[in-house]
Amino acid sequence: MKFLLLVLAALRFLTQVIPASAGGSKCVSNTPGYCRTYCHQGETALFMCNASRKCCVSYSFLPKPDLPQLIGNHWQSRRRNTQRKDKKQQTTVTS
């Protein structure tokens, strides 16, 4: 029983003394990332925290890129035009 109490006391002491570094320290205060040696799956490195650690940020926190939207069926209409040209060439060759 005394041994169990000694083990529990030692574990409680160690949890207060040893920092929890499994997740890494926070990057700059405005960045929602953590300084790590290797980024986890689903994360990307934005910048270096120091010479050996990267600021890893989850993809869900990154802004979505503004891509231009296609208007209507632009690509399909171009495809139809090329098919018409091919048909015209076939009819002129056979005539």
Curated annotation (Swiss-Prot):
One of the GO biological process terms: defense response to Gram-negative bacterium
Record's compositionally biased regions (Basic residues): 76-87
InterPro entries assigned: Beta-defensin, Beta_defensin_dom
Keywords: Antibiotic, Antimicrobial, Defensin, Disulfide bond, Secreted, Signal
Intracellular or extracellular location(s): Secreted
TM annotation in the entry: none
Assigned GO CC terms: extracellular region
Main location: secreted
Region Disordered, residue ranges: 72-95
Signal sequence region: 1-22
Entry-linked Pfam families: Defensin_beta_2
Disulfide bonds listed in the record: 27-55, 35-49, 39-56
Function: Has antibacterial activity.
Homology family: Belongs to the beta-defensin family.
Alphabetical list of PANTHER family matching this protein: BETA-DEFENSIN 123 (PTHR15001:SF3), BETA-DEFENSIN 123-RELATED (PTHR15001)
Name this protein carries in UniProt: Beta-defensin 132
